[in-house]
Regions:
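Short, Lys/Arg-rich, polar N-terminal cytosolic tail immediately upstream
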Residues: 1-8
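Interfacial segments of alpha-helical transmembrane regions
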Residues: 9-23, 98-102
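Helical transmembrane-bundle signal
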Residues: 18-32, 76-79, 83-86, 106-116, ...
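Hydrophobic transmembrane helix segments
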Residues: 21-69, 75
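Juxtamembrane helix-loop boundaries in multi-pass membrane proteins
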Residues: 65-69, 96-105, 130
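Juxtamembrane helix-break-helix junctions at the cytosolic face
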Residues: 80-100
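Membrane-helix boundary connector in multi-pass membrane proteins
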Residues: 111-131
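Membrane-water interface at the C-terminal end of transmembrane alpha helices
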Residues: 136-154
Length: 154
């Protein structure tokens, strides 16, 4: 008698969704952490000045901006790292705690959307599409392997 459970393809490989999200977050975090703004148009839309104009007009405020910008990148680096490690090991193996903890991911991106709703509409149109994609992907990554984490009771 063979008691081996055969996983469906989408259950077995859903962890790759979170691995991909983690890699994207990590890739964006590195220049962010080093102080390289990869979207200067967003800064200009929100602040009304280019980064260079901000640096010239208010060096102290620019230092504050740069500190928070770089430390946000450091936070993203940690977020991406843990996302990658958990998806590669615990989530891939079907450990329930990882499924529960990964509900933070769509909640995080949804909270980012809510926070972004206070920005000018031009900024929202830049931020919303990738956030919506990340929310949908993370929900798919949670719901596709549901039976892997919570098998039917016979």
């Amino acid at each position: 008698m063979n008691n081996k459970v055969v996983e469906k393809f989408y259950e077995k490989y859903a962890w790759i969704i979170f691995l991909g999200i983690g890699i994207m977050v990590l890739a964006g975090a590195i220049p962010h952490m080093l102080g390289f703004n990869t979207d200067p148009a967003l800064v200009e839309t929100i602040g009304g000045q280019t980064i260079d104009e901000l640096k010239l007009s208010s060096p102290m405020f620019f230092n504050l901006y740069n500190f928070y910008f770089s430390s946000g990148g450091l936070s993203d680096l940690g977020f991406g790292f843990f996302l990658i490690v958990i998806s590669l090991f615990a989530y891939r193996q079907g450990q329930k705690w990882s499924w529960y903890s990964f509900w933070f991911i769509p909640a995080f991106f949804l909270a980012f959307m809510v926070l972004s709703s206070t920005l000018p509409s031009e900024s929202q149109s830049i931020l919303y599409p990738p956030l919506i994609v990340l929310i949908i992907l993370s929900l798919a990554g949670l719901l596709l392997p549901f039976r892997k984490f919570f098998p039917k009771k016979h």
